UniProtKB/Swiss-Prot annotation:
It is an enzyme of class 2 (transferase). This is tRNA N6-adenosine threonylcarbamoyltransferase. It comes from Salmonella paratyphi B (strain ATCC BAA-1250 / SPB7). The keyword Transit peptide does not apply. The gene is tsaD. PROSITE patterns: GLYCOPROTEASE. One of its GO terms (biological process) is tRNA threonylcarbamoyladenosine modification. Substrate binds at residues 134-138, 167, 180, 272. One of its GO terms (cellular component) is cytoplasm. Its cofactor is Fe(2+).
């Protein structure tokens, strides 16, 4: 069985084809980073228009890459939410239209479930149960996962997501969009310990996060210490260390409260090398395992949507003739498979 996956929730157009026996057959991705760079962030209207231009050509490229034709596709999966409403509607409309034209099922996919299941695409996929850390520009959540659709929210950010805090702090440091990866690169040249940032909400019980205060702390630190290159690198290092330590502390608490031995990390920020190293070290000490997707599957992509669509289709999930998206869509509302 082969599923075509379409991802258009924000500023990446991702198309992939997944075969339940052969694995990933094609993966095409177009990033709009250059389009939005001059604005310092994603402009929803521009994102939607660019998805309109790129989605169909990328589908054609994916079919060519896989050596397939439309008649070889058994189902079409598309991101139905959460995300930017206009961007979601592009992918949903194309996906639903193709499914109708090809006379195959259409499968609406939850964007964050796609991220959560992305490590399943690797050679050594995690087994249930596990604690999942979903960490991206729009979400920071800890979730107890005991099966497909069996998700319990343990904690989440009460303000900025970790990825959003990275991007905002990068902007304060004068870095271009997207700032998160550039801040991490700058942090690698920084001196540890010159500046010490707080670890928000780690001095109290619970698994919720708060990252907005770190941005304010960074702004005050920059204002008080000048902006020579080394100082900026040292501030970037202090900021990254604070975010990574906070995530690690909360993950440890979540593992202790659930008793699970496996940790899955997913979402754009999961590509951060410092975070990966710290969590791997923590799990080694706990005699547990940590799992994550390869870097290209940490950010938005069609492969995770094709795979999640395959899983959901086998569980009996399909869409009706309507084109419906949900810009806000709690993961806990998904049915168990």
């Amino acid at each position: 069985m082969r599923v075509l996956g379409i991802e258009t929730s924000c500023d990446e157009t991702g198309i992939a084809i997944y075969d339940d026996k052969k694995g990933l057959l094609a993966n095409q991705l177009y990033s709009q980073v250059k389009l939005h760079a001059d604005y310092g962030g994603v402009v929803p209207e521009l994102a939607s228009r660019d998805h309109v231009r790129k989605t169909v050509p990328l589908i054609q490229a994916a079919l060519k890459e896989a050596g397939l034709t439309a008649s070889d596709i058994d189902a079409v999966a598309y991101t139905a939410g959460p995300g930017l409403v206009g961007a979601l509607l592009v992918g949903a409309t194309v996906g639903r239209s193709l499914a109708f034209a090809w006379n195959v099922p259409a499968i609406p996919v939850h964007h964050m479930e796609g991220h959560l299941l992305a490590p399943m695409l690797e050679d050594n996929p995690p087994e249930f149960p596990f604690v999942a850390l979903l960490v991206s520009g729009g979400h920071t959540q800890l979730i107890s996962v005991t099966g497909i659709g069996q998700y319990e929210l343990l904690g989440e950010s009460i303000d900025d997501a970790a990825g959003e805090a990275f991007d905002k702090t990068a902007k304060l440091l004068g870095l271009d969009y997207p700032g998160g990866p550039m801040l991490s690169k700058m942090a690698s040249q920084g001196t540890a310990g010159r500046f010490v940032f707080p670890r928000p909400m780690t001095d109290r019980p619970g698994l919720d996060f708060s990252f907005s205060g770190l941005k304010t702390f960074a702004a005050n630190t920059i204002r008080s210490n000048g902006d020579d290159e080394q100082t900026r690198a040292d501030i970037a290092r202090a900021f990254e260390d604070a975010v990574v330590d906070t995530l690690m502390i909360k993950c440890k608490r979540a593992l202790e409260s659930t008793g699970f031995k496996r940790l899955v990390m997913a979402g754009g920020v999961s590509a951060n090398r410092t975070l990966r190293a710290k969590l791997a070290e923590m799990m080694q000490k706990r005699r547990g395992e940590v799992f994550y997707a390869r870097p290209e599957f940490c950010t938005d992509n069609g492969a995770m949507i094709a795979y999640a669509g395959m899983v959901r289709f086998k569980a009996g999930v399909t869409a009706d003739l309507g084109v419906t998206v949900r810009p806000r869509w709690p993961l806990a509302e998904l049915p168990a498979a």
